[in-house]
Swiss-Prot record:
This is LexA repressor. NCBIfam families: lexA (TIGR00498). It comes from Marinomonas sp. (strain MWYL1). Its EC number is 3.4.21.88. Signal peptide: none annotated. The active site is at residues 126, 163.
Amino acid sequence: MIKLTKRQSDVLETIREFISETGFPPTRAEIARRLGFKSPNAAEEHLKALCKKGAIEMLSGASRGIRLVDRASNDDPTDNLGLPVIGKVAAGYPILAQENIASHVNIPANMFSPQADYFLSVSGTSMKDIGIMEGDLLAVHKTTTVRNGQIVVARIGDEVTVKRFEQKGSIVRLIPENEEFNDIIVDLESEEFAIEGLSVGVIRQGL
């Protein structure tokens, strides 16, 4: 078990709460505002301490480059299967179909708010600027109700993607968090589209 100071625990809980509320990690300035620090530099020092203790990982060059570290162990065969990890989604199958489940991870669903129903294995770098990297596990709450600005898992035809959601009338714009990628524009009147879930957190495995 990681031993944290009271202030380090506060910072870690703030990160978890922010991810639960928005689907992506906070910046140093946002942590400082929430906890009443005088400057983002104070938040940075606590983040470095959390990183050194293995509670988080920090990505250089990204303002939201904070990731919670999955330290759960699956070594005990008596453990429950845990939440399913969705790998490549097979065309024509519901996202939680057995054909799509690559594995399970023993992480409590109620670690996230709203609670996670499954994890999606992230492929690609279109969301890297908010700390969602290839190979990460994206915690997803299964819902079809989302708001503009939230990070969603969406299905366009037979393809599943993770993007920031914006809708105006019958036009949906799926926005990447990487300037190398273009927005995806969907016309609901002529294209097949569905919301598969809401991002409620992101975890990197194996550290």
